[in-house]
A protein has these predicted regions:
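Phosphate/pyrophosphate-binding and catalytic-coupling "lid/hinge/switch" segments at subdomain interfaces
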Residues: 2, 101, 135-136
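Helicase P-loop NTPase motor core
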Residues: 2-93, 116-120, 152, 176, ...
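Short secondary-structure transition/capping segments
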Residues: 9, 107-110
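Proline- and acidic/polar-enriched loop/turn elements at helix boundaries
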Residues: 28, 72, 98-99, 162, ...
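Positions that flank functional sites
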Residues: 75, 101-102
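Conserved helicase C-terminal RecA-like lobe
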Residues: 80-92, 105, 112-278
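Conserved RecA-like helicase motor-core motifs
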Residues: 91-101
Length: 278
């Protein structure tokens, strides 16, 4: 509160007084009164993000402010996606404090790796990321052997997997069964890829891989946050499919292309000190 204006502190005091279960206290500030608080109503989170980004862009232009003069506060980790996407769409540089950017979080990168592998089975990096996630008993030694054999043939790991019954890499029956299970899982997604629109395909992959069940199994605050992030990713895909200017059905490949554009490194070229803080 010592860094806040009197207007903000007075508003906070008004909220605190409403909590009758808390011991009464009065916070204060020695700073100037500051500008009045503005309350904006939005129909949904996408509109909220657009309003906030537009307000930042407008104020920066009218009052000759720096991006670093702005901060966006939100309550839960999953809420960062909508603000990040809104800022990116307006080419406003930002940095996330206390957390990773939404699309850089482990659980999101895991899900996107499944999406990419489904769309492009030659993506070895995505395959290596998810072949044993959620845990299915395929260890590093097995993966190293597959990768070495693929390198020897100058081909991809997926090609080796789909022809595993034609080669002898010294795997026991249990390991072969696990590898076949993974291969069949991805093939099943590939068979439905062009028959399903982006959201339905994404939800199918997240459900059938067991990612949601894995995140639900451990109710620590960190895992609850990860689960909420994956749900928020699905919300983003839903918005992507519903906010089209034409009647074309969007596929998972279309969504991945959109993600690539949104996470383009162009914004990273801006001065790291001159960014909106979120």
């Amino acid at each position: 509160n010592y860094r806040s204006t009197q207007t903000i502190v007075k508003a906070a005091n008004s909220v605190i007084r409403m909590n009758r279960k808390q011991i009464a206290k009065e916070v204060y500030s020695n700073k100037e009164p500051g500008v009045p608080i503005r309350v904006v109503k939005a129909a949904e989170d996408r509109e909220e993000g657009f309003i906030v980004a537009g307000h930042i862009s407008d104020l920066r232009f009218r009052e000759q402010l720096a991006y670093s003069d702005f901060a966006v506060l939100y309550r839960t980790n999953a809420q960062s996606r909508i603000f990040e996407e809104s800022l990116r769409r307006m080419n406003i540089p930002y940095r996330v404090f206390g957390s990773l950017s939404f699309y850089q979080r482990k659980e999101i990168k895991d899900v996107l790796a499944y999406f990419r592998l489904t769309v492009n089975p030659k993506d070895d990096e995505s395959l290596k990321r998810v072949i044993n996630y959620p845990l299915r008993g395929i260890g590093k030694t097995t993966l190293d052997r597959l990768e070495a054999y693929a390198g020897k043939l100058n081909t991809g790991i997926w090609t080796v997997l789909v022809h595993l019954d034609q080669v002898n890499l010294g795997f026991n029956r249990g390991t072969l069964a696990k590898l076949k299970g993974f291969t069949d899982l991805i093939r099943g997604f590939q068979d439905r890829l062009l028959k399903m629109e982006a959201f339905d395909m994404a939800y199918t992959i997240i459900r059938e891989t067991g990612i949601l069940d894995d995140l639900k199994s451990d109710q620590t605050p960190e895992n609850v946050s990860r689960y909420e992030n994956v749900e928020e990713l699905l919300n983003g895909i839903k918005e992507f499919t519903e906010n089209l200017e034409d009647d074309r059905e969007m596929t998972l490949a279309d969504f991945l292309q959109e993600v690539t554009l949104m996470t383009d490194a162009d914004l990273e070229k801006d001065d790291d000190r001159n960014r909106v803080s979120i």
